[in-house]
């Protein structure tokens, strides 16, 4: 055998071996792929889809939800009964083809099964998600329905337990409960017949009506309590109190109290009847009006009771106060009468008792009977309180004015005493001033000083004459005393000025000698000042004339002389 043939045979054998090895490798790989596909299929088969479907079945879906569930359930049935069987068939076919080394067809079957499994996986995911959505939706719907029913049942139970608290509104509340119950029944009917949208709307209304009725029923007991308990109790209390006050002889300015009681009763009854409509705002407003009427009645009674306490206390004070004021008036009258014998008293308000007497007589005739018959007259105590308070105010004013008269009376005799003391003092001062002027050895007395002196003397004389009368005019004495006091003070001041002007003029005239020989103006002023001093006795004008001339030649000289004089000035010794 030639070497070429041998090489050919060897090559063929090698190719066969290589082909076999490749076939074995491909077959092994395909076995692995088929096994993986088998595992994927088994994992899908093992998914709890059927259990989830059974759980959803237990929810008793209705309407659109039930139709949706049926579609997904049918899809799962198709997958579990047909698709998986078809995959099993193709997997067996792929195994057979792979075992027979028909790798191309085997690979085709493997790819086909892979594609089918991918589609099945996606379908199963969709099925499970749809089932979960149905479960969640049903749970929400169920929870919503349960919540609405719980609200209704709770409300129904609460109303049943507190039925007595709703008064006349109970029939309307029961009617509302029946309407809500009918709405729930309608919801169940619609839900069962597969109309979930309308059923949801009905459920919404039922829930809203339940909540609204609950809010209303929470407010009703407080309103009913006022109408059935509070107001009647207050009205009974008012009527009982009114009867007791009448028995105790109370009287009221308001003459329609019985009518007001009746109006309150009618308002309570009317509001109770109107509450049937469940118009709570109107009922509350009306309750407030009723309470205001009741409060006004309480105010009337409390005002009279309080007025009684004040008026009763005042009725004990007024007689004593009146007696005290009358006693004061009598004492004042006696004192004024005594003083009238000695003094001329003008009929002025400060010493007049007429207004006091009139006030006291009016109280005695118009008020005292009410005081003495307190508790027996048919007068409201509020009226008596006002009358008595006004009376006490009048008595207080009378007493204050009486005290002023007492003070005025007390000062009358002291006015005379003080005037007599001043009279003696003023006469003495007048003599001392006269002697003081005489000692000055002046060339003459200025006319204006003489006028002041004689005027003061006349005023002192007038005071002496007034005090010498049998009956002294005390007002005239008081006036003359004041006038004389001022006159003496003015005369004393005028005396000091005259003496000062005269003394300073003499000093300045002497001092001017040092300038007269060479200052013509000083010489001229000297002559004029000397004339005013010795002839006209106008010491003030003389001082002004010479001081002005000296100031022109020696500024400040006048102040120097004035200061020196003031330090050594002689005072009148009274």
Curated annotation (Swiss-Prot):
Secretion signal, residue range per the UniProt entry: none
Transmembrane region(s): 8-26
A GO CC term attached to the entry: plasma membrane
Subcellular location: Cell membrane
Stretches in topological domain Extracellular: 1-7
Pfam families assigned to the protein according to its UniProt record, in alphabetical order: EzrA
Ranges in a coiled coil: 104-141, 275-343, 473-525
Gene Ontology BP term (one): division septum assembly
Membrane topology: Single-pass membrane protein
Positions on the Cytoplasmic side per record topology: 27-574
Keyword terms, alphabetized: Cell cycle, Cell division, Cell membrane, Coiled coil, Membrane, Septation, Transmembrane, Transmembrane helix
Family: Belongs to the EzrA family.
Function: Negative regulator of FtsZ ring formation; modulates the frequency and position of FtsZ ring formation. Inhibits FtsZ ring formation at polar sites. Interacts either with FtsZ or with one of its binding partners to promote depolymerization.
Protein name: Septation ring formation regulator EzrA
Annotated gene: ezrA
């Amino acid at each position: 055998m030639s070497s070429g043939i041998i090489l050919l045979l060897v090559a063929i054998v090698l190719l066969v071996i290589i082909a076999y090895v490749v076939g074995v490798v491909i077959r092994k790989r395909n076995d692995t792929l088929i096994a993986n596909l088998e595992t994927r299929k088994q994992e899908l088969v093992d998914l709890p889809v059927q259990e989830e479907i059974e759980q959803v079945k237990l929810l008793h879906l209705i309407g659109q939800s039930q139709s949706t569930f049926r579609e997904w359930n049918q899809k799962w049935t198709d997958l579990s009964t047909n698709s998986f069987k078809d995959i099993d068939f193709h997997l067996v076919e792929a195994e057979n083809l792979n075992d027979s080394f028909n790798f191309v067809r085997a690979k085709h079957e493997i790819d086909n099964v892979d594609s089918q499994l991918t589609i099945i996986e996606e379908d199963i995911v969709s099925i499970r998600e749809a089932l979960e959505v149905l479960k969640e939706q049903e749970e929400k719907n169920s929870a919503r329905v349960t919540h609405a029913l719980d609200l209704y049942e709770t409300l129904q139970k609460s109303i049943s337990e507190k039925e007595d608290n709703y008064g006349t509104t109970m029939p309307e509340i029961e009617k509302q409960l029946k309407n809500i119950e009918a709405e729930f029944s309608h919801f169940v009917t619609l839900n069962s017949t597969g109309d979930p949208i309308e059923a949801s709307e009905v459920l919404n209304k039922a829930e809203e009506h339940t909540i609204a009725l609950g809010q209303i029923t929470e407010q009703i007991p407080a309103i009913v309590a006022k109408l059935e308990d509070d107001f009647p109790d207050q009205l009974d209390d008012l009527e009982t109190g009114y009867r007791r006050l009448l028995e105790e002889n109370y009287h009221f300015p308001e003459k329609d109290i019985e009518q007001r009681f009746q109006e309150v009763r009618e308002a309570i009854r009317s509001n109770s009847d109107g509450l049937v409509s469940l118009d709570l705002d109107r009922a509350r407003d009306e309750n407030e009006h009723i309470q205001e009427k009741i409060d006004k009645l309480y105010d009337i009674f409390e005002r009279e009771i309080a007025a009684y306490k004040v008026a009763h206390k005042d009725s004990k004070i007024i007689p004593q106060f009146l007696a005290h004021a009358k006693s004061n008036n009598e004492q004042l009258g006696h004192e004024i009468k005594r003083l009238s014998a000695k003094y001329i008293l003008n009929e002025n308000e400060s010493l007049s008792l007429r207004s006091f007497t009139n006030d006291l007589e009016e109280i005695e005739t118009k008020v005292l009977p009410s005081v003495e018959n307190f508790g027996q007259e048919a007068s409201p105590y509020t009226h008596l309180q006002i009358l008595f308070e006004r009376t006490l105010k009048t008595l207080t004013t009378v007493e204050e004015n009486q005290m002023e008269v007492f003070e005025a009376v007390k000062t009358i005799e002291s006015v005379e005493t003080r005037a007599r003391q001043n009279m003696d003092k003023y006469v003495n001062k007048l003599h001392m001033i006269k002697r003081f002027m005489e000692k000055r050895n002046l060339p003459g007395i200025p006319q204006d000083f003489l006028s002041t002196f004689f005027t003061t003397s006349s005023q002192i004389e007038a005071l002496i004459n007034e005090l010498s009368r049998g009956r002294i005019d005390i007002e005239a004495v008081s006036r003359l005393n004041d006038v004389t006091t001022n006159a003496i003070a003015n005369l004393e001041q005028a005396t000091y000025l005259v003496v000062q002007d005269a003394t300073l003029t003499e000093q300045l005239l002497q001092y001017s000698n040092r300038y007269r020989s060479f200052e013509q103006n000083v010489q001229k002023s000297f002559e004029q000042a000397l004339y005013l001093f010795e002839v006209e006795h106008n010491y003030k004008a003389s001082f002004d004339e010479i001081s002005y001339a000296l100031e022109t030649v020696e500024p400040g000289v006048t102040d120097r002389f004035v200061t020196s004089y003031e330090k050594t000035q002689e005072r009148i010794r009274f």
